Amino acid sequence: MANILRKVIENDKGEIRKLEKIAKKVEAYADEMEALTDQELQAKTPEFKKRYQAGETLEDLLPEAFAVVREASRRVLGLYPYRVQIMGGVVLHNGDVPEMRTGEGKTLTATMPVYLNALAGEGVHVITVNEYLSTRDATEMGEVYSWLGLSVGINLAAKSPAEKREAYLCDITYSTNSEVGFDYLRDNMVVRQEDMVQRPLNFALVDEVDSVLIDEARTPLIVSGAVSSETNQLYVRADMFVKTLKEDDYIIDVPTKTIGLSDLGIDKAESYFNLNNLYDIDNVALTHFIDNALRANYIMLLDIDYVVSEDGEILIVDQFTGRTMEGRRFSDGLHQAIEAKEGVRIQEESKTSASITYQNMFRMYKKLAGMTGTAKTEEEEFREVYNMRIIPIPTNKPVARLDHTDLLYPTLASKFRAVIADVKARHEKGQPVLVGTVAVETSDYISKQLVAAGVPHEVLNAKNHFKEAQIIMNAGQRGAVTIATNMAGRGTDIKLGEGVRELGGLCVIGTERHESRRIDNQLRGRAGRQGDPGESQFYLSLEDDLMRRFGSDRIKAFLDRMRLEEEDAVIKSGMLARQVESAQKRVEGNNYDTRKQVLQYDDVMREQREIIYANRRDVITANRDLGPEIKAMIKRTIKRTVDAHARSNRNDAIDAIVAFARTNIVPEESISAKDLRSLKDDQIKEELYKRALAIYESQISKLHDQEAVLEFQKVLILMIVDNKWTEHIDALDQLRNSVGLRGYAQNNPVVEYQSEGFKMFQDMIGAIEFDVTRTMMKAQIHEQERERVSPNARTTAAQNIAAQSNQSSESSTQDYSHVKRNDLCPCGSGKKFKNCHGRKAF
């Protein structure tokens, strides 16, 4: 172990030496740049662009380009990047993560690699965690870029598509992680190329990269549409039932936060809903409502997992930042169950039209880099998932913060009494204090206690984060007391007020340990910026969530040996610190394994999504006739149908093929069994395809010009692809929920999901081609006046076409008595008969 540690330290030192060497090359240009006039310095940007286009690489340009930005920053902002900031900039340009402590100037560090990469003309995205930081950084650092001749855009959620497109066309675009993701999804749902807003994804520089790529890695970005539902009453009934339960009626697994009915609870459910068997197949929907009601009432906690806004809306609380996540909803009906629990209006369920996780969103960039003050603990994940190294950058000045040993109390009450006493004592001497909490309710509790103790303070949590930057900026003033959930206000420096250094600087008090050591380190790092003095102290109790779930037995045994009997007694021990860190490592390991598994599942969706979106983009951007593609789909649909009946009784097969042709391709009276009976399979395919081509040409001739033809072809394909893709996403979600149970049968759920997901994708492609064929053949196309119609009118017309073709196919009744349940359905959908036209029969 010692050898491994030594090797890691030596590697880090070697990396630092390389970075210092490059930084010295940048510094060597300082005098030359200082001697240039403003016009000469600004002329460097077009010069660099020409040199890049002439064949020089960005690496060739780096020392001089970085030096230009340094000098421009000095002239425009009055800030001159230190050597350690140059080193951080080099790491960012290389697509890695420089770990830079709080207050070391990460925002200024980013200007150098952002400028350099923007010279390529392919766009640079600077990603922040909220719109306040995007706007602030774009405004402040944008002065440097604009002065140097580069364009800067800010992408905000409230902007129109035209404004977003303009922002993305800039050399440098500031945006939040969620908005970039949603724009990507929306771009892959539009019908016209001019409605797209993004360029190809080139280089992303992510601020607070651990928050985005680790903490929110499992969070899917979902674009969904409302589904009309009559189920609100079921949510209410399930909630009413669950509220009648006692502790013996359900079982909670605390470490995994899962819940289910006990045998007693099952009996009560059957009695309450008047059922013979709760888990009968007919009651699957009801069990889903009950499961969600259980989670809502006994797992999801008010002011910890969610808050109720003043207008009665349920808002999710981000577990890592303590902020509310506006516009986001728990999926799979859980949000509606919480609405029923809290007695607010139950909103409609929604159906997912497109989704992507941050993991896969950011892996699509050609180059990805990020900045944070705390990433070393997640080094393995950054390397394995994102292929990014973590490079610790030395501080500009030595850290002078004093980190005290944790204090452990037997109960929550005794711990909080100690916290209040400590805060009051420090406030009285004028030392500013930042109190960090894990949950909103803890913030509120401490606030009430401080009011009772007569200590003036500010509260920063999910309920008032609009003021967070202002509150955080004042948190270093003499006598200031600030309570903040987790890392609320992250990204804003706490600068010390006059006379505070002499009082010991800012004191950070943690009211409990977080599951992640990284979050604790972030809280500590708020004190002692840029060599300032500071202190940190964590207060723990045996009743803390982390202790209760992962560490209390050993620690309790230790305390028993210490004969700790008084409630206000306190323990300070190195062994205790090691036990807490061990518990945190276990949780971090569990969380990493979970994220890894999510990625394995999402990779299946990623591969399929990329195929669908690439084909979609090809259709949207096409200036050519899409007839060959549609004809190929028709040909494959006919082939699939004929091949599906190759092994059937010949007469039955011919009857089924004729039924398929009448329903989906040719006019009903134009074909009969005798037309095909003497032909071989290949000849049948040729005959049907020949007839289909004639109908295709007839249909296309009804459109007045090539522009109208292309428009019709595009809308036809896109409408069907989008509809089938939405259904497929829903089916994959259901598959994912079901394969988990197969682990009990010694099957690997991920492998099962990959295998079945691939088959479902193949079926979906077949279903798309079948629907395109049927709609193309059976649609009623009317020649229209030569005029431009709105996109909405086009889409509506296409939907009407689909509805007409669906009506014609459903109205044709066929005899399927000869078809077996596991045969492919004669209609040509590509589905098994039992899952298609045989569904009612079976």
From Swiss-Prot:
ATP binds at Q85, G103, E104, G105, K106, T107, D493. It is a peripheral membrane protein. Belongs to the SecA family. This is Protein translocase subunit SecA. GO terms for biological process: intracellular protein transmembrane transport; protein import; protein targeting; protein transport by the Sec complex. May bind 1 zinc ion per subunit. Coiled coil: none annotated. The keyword Cytoplasm applies. Keywords: ATP-binding, Cell membrane, Cytoplasm, Membrane, Metal-binding, Nucleotide-binding, Protein transport, Translocase, Translocation, Transport, Zinc. It is found in: Cell membrane; Cytoplasm. It is an enzyme of class 7 (translocase). Transmembrane segments: none annotated. It holds the Pfam family SEC-C. InterPro entries: Helicase_ATP-bd, Helicase_C-like, P-loop_NTPase, SEC_C_motif, SecA, SecA_CS, SecA_DEAD, SecA_motor_DEAD. Its EC number is 7.4.2.8. Its main location: membrane.
